Each structure stands twice: as C-alpha cells, then as structure tokens.
C-alpha cells in the first residue's frame, strides 16, 4: 500500500491556508500611513539606554531581590504566595477591627470636649 493516513498536523496546516488574492503588491497596498512617522519614532532614544523611570529610582535592593524571587516561582507556588498574602491581609483586618472596637469601648477615640 503506497498511501498513508493524514496526520493531524497536515489537517491543521491545510485549514490555515488562505487562497485570498491581493490586488497589488504589499508596498503599494500598504504604503506608509503617515509620512515621516518612522523617522520620528526612530529619533527617540531607546528606553534601555535612557535614564531609568522615576518609579525605579525608589526601588531598593530588597525590592529587587523580592521581584527576582517572585519571578522564579512556579505558577502553583506563586498562587500559594498570593493566598498567604490574602490570608494575612484578612487577619490584619480582623485585628484592626478588634482594636478599633476596644478603643471605642475604652473611649480613647473620642474628641476632647472644649
């Protein structure tokens, strides 16, 4: 038998074929939309060579280390870290609520009367 079954990749490639005919060649069909834009964009310095953004000036070494640590985590480990932070935030909210209630009962939050 000289024939073989078509593989799934052959079917995929066949489904991606386009038989659309363009009227003109690409440069004629898609001329530069706004003349001079390419030169204008090229005139700006690369963001890599320019000075770092303002927000990066405030980042400390510990922050960079934390970003590297978070970047090296797997998806599951990152989700576990996020869950831990959510639980911590919830617990801090409960503690704050408890302390505010305590302060209210002790009348330490009232404004002094004049």
Curated annotation (Swiss-Prot):
Any one of the GO BP annotations: regulation of DNA-templated transcription
PANTHER family with a match to the protein in the record: LIN52 FAMILY MEMBER, PROTEIN LIN-52 HOMOLOG
Organism: Pongo abelii (Sumatran orangutan)
Keywords: Phosphoprotein
Residue numbers bearing the Phosphoserine modification: 26, 51
Cellular component, GO annotation: DRM complex
Subunit structure as annotated in this protein's UniProt entry: Component of the DREAM complex (also named LINC complex) at least composed of E2F4, E2F5, LIN9, LIN37, LIN52, LIN54, MYBL1, MYBL2, RBL1, RBL2, RBBP4, TFDP1 and TFDP2. The complex exists in quiescent cells where it represses cell cycle-dependent genes. It dissociates in S phase when LIN9, LIN37, LIN52 and LIN54 form a subcomplex that binds to MYBL2.
A Pfam family: LIN52
Superkingdom to which the source organism belongs: Eukaryota
Family assignment from sequence similarity: Belongs to the lin-52 family.
Name by which UniProt lists this protein: Protein lin-52 homolog
